[in-house]
Amino acid sequence: MEARAVGKYIRISPQKARLVADVVRGMGVDQAITTLRFMPKKGAVILQKVIESALANATQDDQADVDNLYVKVITIDGGPSLKRIRPRAMGRATGIIKRTSHITVVLDEN
């Protein structure tokens, strides 16, 4: 039994979100949430919300045993980028790219 949750258009760069995702991939759900709670990264809070959403989906749909769930798949894909301008000296301007992410979490039973 698999449970999925997707967070789309999240305002964090995929590179920074993948640092956190690599830590919890393959962990049990309880251990992953505890690890993310004490991790001092912006991506940890975001990933924790998506994992908790997948956990809620698992309990809502199939009445799955929460104790046996683990993080089977976490994928961080790039979303659309926001283009901004930063003024510089002598009337110039440089571009800034604010990246977004699509986060997919799949939970499965052992």
From Swiss-Prot:
GN (gene name): rplV
Domain of life: Bacteria
InterPro entries: Ribosomal_uL22, Ribosomal_uL22_bac/chlpt-type, Ribosomal_uL22_bac/org-type, Ribosomal_uL22_CS, Ribosomal_uL22_sf
SUPFAM superfamilies: Ribosomal protein L22
Function: This protein binds specifically to 23S rRNA; its binding is stimulated by other ribosomal proteins, e.g. L4, L17, and L20. It is important during the early stages of 50S assembly. It makes multiple contacts with different domains of the 23S rRNA in the assembled 50S subunit and ribosome. The globular domain of the protein is located near the polypeptide exit tunnel on the outside of the subunit, while an extended beta-hairpin is found that lines the wall of the exit tunnel in the center of the 70S ribosome.
This protein's name: Large ribosomal subunit protein uL22
Subunit organization: Part of the 50S ribosomal subunit.
Source taxonomy: Bacteria, Pseudomonadati, Thermodesulfobacteriota, Desulfobulbia, Desulfobulbales
Keyword Transmembrane applies: no
Organism of this sequence: Desulfotalea psychrophila (strain LSv54 / DSM 12343)
Gene Ontology terms for molecular function: rRNA binding; structural constituent of ribosome
PROSITE patterns tied to this protein: RIBOSOMAL_L22
Gene3D superfamilies: Ribosomal protein L22/L17
Keywords linked to the UniProt accession: Ribonucleoprotein, Ribosomal protein, RNA-binding, rRNA-binding
GO biological process, one term: translation
Family: Belongs to the universal ribosomal protein uL22 family.
Entry's Gene Ontology cellular component terms: cytosolic large ribosomal subunit
A Pfam family of this chain: Ribosomal_L22
NCBIfam families with a match to the protein in the record: rplV_bact
